[in-house]
């Protein structure tokens, strides 16, 4: 997918990531862990799952990414959705979110979830804020071993793709 980034002359390409993107993805995620926006991911983990990511590329630079990981046959999670600080506010996150939703639809995944500090873009895309226990596959797989489990300040959001009418424009 190719888009025109808002408030810039750059052409933005959203594409599936490759192993060659892993280091750039890792560096982008790591720069946001320090700010408390994302959970830490190891380079090895990002390399192992690089093909589950979508990459936003502008001027041959990775400026955003997001991962779609299947938690069960019924639920997939959007993880590590992040845009480079200097590129925020240009619609890049919305384009990445659209690509991840489209991929979930293509894979016939009935439900998407995410845990986020910033629920607004998800809600604008049709997600609903829900209590954490409503996303039990995520809790069972990841949350119980997280050091923030008992004091998690992230919002749980879900999107029912069986009734979804369309990805954000």
What are these regions (language model features)?
Residues 110, 116-142:
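Conserved active-site alpha-helix within GNAT-family acetyltransferase domains
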Residues 29-62:
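Active-site rim helix/loop that mediates acceptor-substrate recognition in acyltransferases
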Residues 12-25:
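A short beta-loop-alpha structural element at the N-terminal edge
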Residues 61, 84-95, 107, 124:
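Conserved glycine-rich acetyl-CoA-binding loop
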Residues 89-102, 114:
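Conserved acetyl-CoA-binding loop-helix of GNAT-fold acetyltransferases
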Residues 135-169:
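C-terminal "cap" of GNAT-fold acetyltransferases
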Residues 55, 61-69, 74-82:
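Conserved beta-strand in the GNAT
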């Amino acid at each position: 997918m190719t888009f025109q980034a808002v408030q810039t002359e750059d052409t933005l390409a959203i594409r599936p990531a490759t192993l060659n993107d892993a280091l750039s993805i890792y560096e982008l995620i790591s720069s946001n862990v320090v700010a408390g926006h994302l959970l830490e991911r190891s380079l090895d983990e990002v390399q192992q799952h690089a093909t589950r990511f979508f990459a936003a590329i502008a001027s041959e630079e990775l400026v955003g990414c997001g991962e779609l990981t299947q938690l069960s046959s019924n639920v997939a999670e959007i993880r590590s959705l992040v845009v480079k600080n200097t590129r925020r506010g240009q619609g890049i996150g919305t384009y990445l979110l659209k690509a991840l939703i489209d991929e979930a639809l293509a894979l016939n995944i009935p439900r998407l979830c995410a845990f986020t500090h910033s629920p607004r873009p998800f809600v604008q895309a049709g997600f609903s804020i829900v209590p954490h226990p409503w996303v039990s596959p995520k809790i069972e797989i990841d949350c119980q071993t997280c050091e923030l489990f008992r004091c998690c300040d992230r919002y749980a959001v879900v999107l029912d793709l069986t009734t979804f009418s369309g990805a954000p424009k």
